[in-house]
């Protein structure tokens, strides 16, 4: 499947859109001529971000991705203003303070899974019928943490490994419809979230010191967003940045299903409306 996706005139929904990678993603999408639905639970930061953007091309929604009904309502309301959603970027996520499994607060573990995994499902599920009808595209933001074992971050790593599998399953399940899925794997992105975890926390800083260069190199949110939006346009099945992490990921064998999807052609005709 090699069809490209022209983002001009399309509607994209991005969660975690108030700052960091999410806000950079919004700007990239707007730059391609898309309309964008910005979703975040931080109302003040979201409104501040929205004030820097073209108000005619955005729809701003304050919602928590863990609230299933609220996310379904966002999809309904934004579709009434902008039309059906063509692209979904399930980006919202949190990183807990570093802790070993033995010392972890299991309630914190549950919270990470609720935001990172269930939040992604709550974002994607209400859009799926429209995505299939319009042969749209979904991005699930996983992480290099999904395939890199390490200490002090089991909750985050487990959540991102689960998100990866959601994305890979969706790609297989939607292949016959013409809708497509990208799984995004980021290494270290220079956001406040990363600084809190790796710079300001003693255990996180120690873990960071154990990583050799260039595995510990950080990329900017703008870079992560740019390579991801290019992946959307190409309908790429995965995007990995920094690229070195791709070699690490490639050590895992490709599934036979991946090869079948690469050759698949969509059934029926669902022209873009």
Predicted region positions:
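Active-site helix of classical SDR
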Residues: 124, 159
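Residue(s) in the substrate-gating loop at a strand-loop-helix junction
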Residues: 143
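Substrate-binding pocket helix/loop in short-chain dehydrogenase/reductase
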Residues: 99-101, 105-110, 121, 135
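Conserved glycine-rich Rossmann-like NAD(P)H-binding loop of the short-chain dehydrogenase/reductase
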Residues: 32-48
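SDR active-site lid
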Residues: 172, 176-243
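The beta1-alpha1 cofactor-binding region of Rossmann-like NAD(H)/NADP(H)-dependent oxidoreductases
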Residues: 43-44, 62-73, 106
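Canonical Rossmann dinucleotide-binding motif of NAD(H)/NADP(H)-dependent dehydrogenases/reductases
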Residues: 3-35
